[in-house]
């Protein structure tokens, strides 16, 4: 039977979706995944574990158990990370598939709709990593808050100030693991990141979900001001 999981933020989301398709138990799957011996066997830390699961539709038997499911995912991970893709990792300045997955999860957190922006956003963040600039990605501190910021349009300094190893406003470089399970197309977009000079991005003042990219801080501040003014007007309209 087809087993599909996508738009998963955590291994808990993934286990829940998989348990609806197969006879396995989501709680048993989670405890198996968190078992230190299993993590060591597959070569992941708990934080990196989401990288092992590449969203797709997989054909499996209904009676696939937890152990068989995890082994199948480990096999699919190896198939995806072939020699050609592995060779791309160092070319873009990263070291492991887990790092690629972590960056891809940030790219996907920033942009889940317009796929043409993925390589640009990836290039922008790789520029920040190379220059030693904090990534300052909003989806990373949102991840720290769990579901508490769902539906919040205007994110504030108080939200960004959360102490959390995933908050890229606080830490330098990549967080310890992915903040969601990015589709394979996003992983490939990171491996084929666009060579751009951009350092900043800001949402466009419309409902397109697209971004204005900038090279300088001044340009970015202008974009940010335009967006904040637009957001204020939109919120006033809704109140009328």
What are these language model-derived features?
Residues 33-37:
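Structural preference for solvent-exposed beta-strand-turn elements
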